């Protein structure tokens, strides 16, 4: 227990889920939704100990009477008061540690506004009084977790997807591409296409039900047109899902139409390229000499890459785009849902990393802008 005293805390604040734990562990101790819920109705029973806000799983379990808000949208914190509540909940209720006793490693999406990391830094030092902190890029951590120093990471979470090419440990910033299309957009899209089937989901609480349907039943088709034809001609692809009130709904082609939007963003009315093309474009922005290594080390990471069939589809799509002789390998580790956190745990426990922390002293001397100098 004694090394627990100084263990760094690793907090991967995703748009959808917050993953937190201790550096050196092989999995996060706490995984909970990045949600803050506030009551929609007036409390009438005195002495119930009702709170004015609920965080994480507690908000999720009381969602029927709450308005749920996600303080992180597209990887960027949009509500700092709620974000502080989530961090407070992480330290004091989930990990049960005093943040002033541990260095804290936070993560963020690449190409985030600079003000975002400055504010994160400021809150850590001024509100939580951490002795040291660091902000790492999510995709870089995923590559660490896969045991590579070269590769291109497609990291797709709930709020943002991005492709980050890394060569011998150096991220290539000019070739990083960001796509604001991820899990939450797919949940919204599934809500929309289920409405066409006559099932109406509208409230923030019902969106969580749709998210569950998405996670349990959706998959990526290898050939979309062919799959659509199969779905139209037989009921072999239909699955049923029981809602919390016992009502059973049936979904068919929605199962693969929903994640297809990752490959065809036009389904969502977006002009962007799909994840396969974004990955290819990212590789093409790199030096011609290193492309071969990137094609052979394409690493998937994040919860939105968990759909069955996504790796095979990526392999097929990138093979079609790349030169015909190129060897293409898509790496989809089974733990990729948490690979950002695992990478953070590895990084924060390296002896060589210890001089990289931003200390309270450095912060006091330079202010929040120190984060741009010390963190990539």
Curated annotation (Swiss-Prot):
InterPro entries: Actin, Actin/actin-like_CS, Actin_CS, ATPase_NBD. Residues 1-2 form a propeptide. N-terminal cleavage of acetylated cysteine of immature actin by ACTMAP. Oxidation of Met-45 by Mical to form methionine sulfoxide promotes actin filament depolymerization. Methionine sulfoxide is produced stereospecifically, but it is not known whether the (S)-S-oxide or the (R)-S-oxide is produced. Its main location: cytoplasm. Its EC number is 3.6.4.-. GO terms for molecular function: ATP binding; hydrolase activity. It comes from Drosophila melanogaster. SMART domains: ACTIN. Changing residue 48 to L: Depolymerizes in the presence of Mical. This is Actin-5C. It catalyses: ATP + H2O = ADP + phosphate + H(+). The modification Tele-methylhistidine is found at residue 74. The modification N-acetylaspartate is found at residue 3. Actins are highly conserved proteins that are involved in various types of cell motility and are ubiquitously expressed in all eukaryotic cells. Multiple isoforms are involved in various cellular functions such as cytoskeleton structure, cell mobility, chromosome movement and muscle contraction. In Drosophila there are 6 closely related actin genes. SUPFAM superfamilies: Actin-like ATPase domain. One of its GO terms (cellular component) is Ino80 complex.
